[in-house]
């Protein structure tokens, strides 16, 4: 049964377009904390698979380093792009709550099949190898489909537990994104320590089975909190938001030859009020839709267009971001990983330092730096989201420069045939800087795309944020394939040779640092001219 405003009032209190099932007790930190725990369980499951995926592909499945890295990037890119479809279905038809439940079920099925695929004997015959690979990749992409609905909706559903019109809850909403990442990083840190050890030292089947149980727990906990949630009523009594925005573009195109006088006379009073706002002075060609569209609908279309330059210029950051679970891990596998005689640190565990740095820095940022900055800027988030994103992009470039320098030193040590290999601890600084970079950019992008899209499109807004990582992974995969082909010609060693001591990851890292710097320059230019679509800029 569709919820109407009259029935909403009978069920509970409606605030900022949200339905409270229990008046004065629904939503807020009580519900948000549960959602943080729910996603912690999901992140444990996802990174229990993703963190060590390249080691499984190059190990039991026998793929080359370049092919495995390309497969990881392609899958990660798919995981990041499918939320666009999931967000569309949630915002247009299913709603976030139902989408989370359906996608969680698919997610659990995919993880279960993934664990099953590792039990199939892979070396008995060619047919058994083919069967194992088929089930493995089918289940891997079923997990991606589950992620497509789950990931954009759970974050938005958590943020929706706060009323943006209430000053205190608006600050809490900004803080929610920080603590969501804090919880996620604790979970990711745990799974990288536990799951990767089990996978490499005990059993891949058990190592992939534990994430299945974790995701089952996530769904159970989410359903447990049903009566305490606020549910969005933004779409009640309104047209499909995609249809509204599409209509604006179509009408603007149809009226492109209409005299300006006709446009000025359309909804004249409303036009004068809206054009006083700076954001309405951008993309004036869309004002031609005012003859048949409401001015609020035109502003929604403009808000979506303003996101495109920020989306494009953030992609270079995500190309850099794609290297930590692939080449950083393979790089670490060639180094001295011994802690004590007989005890080696799994290479994938090194990624834990990214999460550890986030866990350490987020409380400092949220409790010290944000209040300090807020006293000067009067911004509820301390600094604007674009400033936060830009800081993270700069740090990612710095991390890539450091990675190139360390790899140059590692290659020198390997080619000098030193009796003691270079210690893996040389990689820790680049992981730590990456972690701090993620804390700024990942949270900043979440806040930005949540706050700058029309309120009815927040699932799609979060999906746009995730799709940046998809674009980065796809472009990284494409770059690797092209560079591998070019550098492998005429009998030369590829930059990504299976023997990393003969490869040139240092050249690749320098290339990424240069691309990152160019992208950062363009980002600064677009960010400087960006006009926020709301006074509340998170």
From Swiss-Prot:
GO biological process: nitrate transmembrane transport
The UniProt record lists the keyword Transmembrane: yes
Organism: Arabidopsis thaliana (Mouse-ear cress)
Membrane disposition: Multi-pass membrane protein
Keywords, ordered alphabetically: Membrane, Phosphoprotein, Transmembrane, Transmembrane helix, Transport
Main location: membrane
GO cellular component terms given for this protein: plant-type vacuole membrane
Superkingdom assignment: Eukaryota
Compartments, as annotated in UniProt: Membrane
MF GO annotations: dipeptide transmembrane transporter activity; low-affinity nitrate transmembrane transporter activity; tripeptide transmembrane transporter activity
Lineage: Eukaryota, Viridiplantae, Streptophyta, Embryophyta, Tracheophyta
Similarity section: Belongs to the major facilitator superfamily. Proton-dependent oligopeptide transporter (POT/PTR) (TC 2.A.17) family.
Transmembrane segments: 44-64, 74-94, 100-120, 134-154, 175-194, 204-224, 308-328, 342-362, 389-409, 424-444, 463-483, 507-527
Modified sites of kind Phosphothreonine: 99
Classification via Gene3D superfamilies: MFS general substrate transporter like domains (1.20.1250.20)
Name of this chain's protein: Protein NRT1/ PTR FAMILY 5.11
Record's keyword annotation contains DNA-binding: no
Tissue expression remark: Expressed in shoots and roots.
């Amino acid at each position: 049964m569709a919820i109407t405003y009259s029935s909403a009032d009978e069920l509970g209190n409606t605030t900022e377009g949200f339905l409270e099932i229990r008046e004065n007790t629904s939503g807020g930190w009580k519900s948000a904390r549960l959602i943080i725990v729910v996603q912690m369980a999901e992140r444990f499951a996802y990174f229990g698979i993703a963190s060590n995926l390249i080691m499984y592909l190059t190990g039991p499945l026998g793929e080359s380093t370049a092919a495995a890295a390309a497969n990881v990037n392609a899958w990660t890119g798919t995981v990041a792009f499918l939320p666009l479809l999931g967000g569309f279905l949630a915002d247009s038809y299913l709603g976030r709550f139902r989408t989370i439940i359906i996608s969680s079920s698919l997610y659990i099925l995919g993880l279960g099949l993934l664990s099953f695929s590792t039990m199939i004997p892979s070396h008995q015959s060619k047919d058994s190898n083919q069967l194992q690979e088929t089930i493995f990749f089918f289940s891997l992409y079923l997990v991606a489909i589950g992620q497509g609905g789950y990931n954009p909706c759970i974050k938005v559903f958590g943020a929706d537990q706060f009323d943006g019109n209430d000053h205190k809850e608006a600050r809490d909403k900004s803080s929610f994104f920080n603590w969501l990442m804090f919880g996620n990083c604790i979970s990711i840190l745990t799974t990288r320590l536990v799951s990767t050890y089990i996978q490499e030292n005990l059993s891949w089947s058990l190592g992939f089975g534990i994430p299945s149980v974790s995701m089952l727990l996530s769904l159970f906990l989410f359903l447990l909190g049903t009566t305490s949630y606020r549910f969005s009523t933004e779409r009640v009594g309104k047209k499909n938001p995609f249809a509204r925005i599409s209509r604006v573009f179509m009408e603007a195109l149809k009226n492109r030859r209409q005299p300006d006088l006709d446009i000025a006379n359309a909804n004249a009073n409303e036009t004068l009020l809206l054009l006083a706002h700076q954001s309405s002075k951008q993309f004036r060609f869309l004002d031609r839709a005012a003859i048949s569209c409401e001015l609020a609908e035109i502003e929604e279309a403009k808000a979506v267009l303003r996101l495109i330059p920020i989306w494009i210029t953030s992609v270079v950051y995500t190309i850099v971001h794609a290297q930590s679970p692939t080449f950083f891990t393979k790089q670490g596998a060639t180094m001295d990983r011994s802690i004590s005689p007989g005890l080696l640190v799994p290479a994938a565990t090194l990624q834990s330092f990214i999460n550890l740095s986030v866990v350490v820095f987020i409380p400092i940022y949220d409790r010290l730096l944000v209040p300090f900055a807020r006293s000067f800027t009067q911004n509820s988030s301390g600094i604007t989201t674009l400033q936060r994103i830009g800081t993270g992009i700069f740090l990612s470039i710095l991390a890539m420069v450091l990675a190139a320098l360390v790899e140059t030193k590692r290659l020198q040590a390997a080619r000098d045939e030193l009796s003691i290999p270079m210690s893996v601890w040389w990689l820790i600084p680049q992981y730590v800087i990456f972690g701090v970079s993620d804390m700024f950019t990942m949270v900043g992008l979440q806040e930005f795309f949540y706050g700058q899209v029309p309120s009815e499109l927040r699932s799609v807004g979060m999906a746009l944020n995730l799709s940046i990582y998809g674009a980065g992974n796809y472009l990284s995969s494409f770059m690797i394939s092209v560079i591998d082909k070019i550098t492998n010609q005429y009998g030369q060693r590829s930059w990504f040779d299976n023997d990393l001591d003969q490869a040139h990851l240092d050249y690749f890292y320098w290339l990424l640092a240069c691309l990152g710097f160019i992208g950062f320059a363009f980002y600064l230019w677009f960010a400087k001219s960006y006009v926020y679509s709301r006074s509340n800029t998170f």
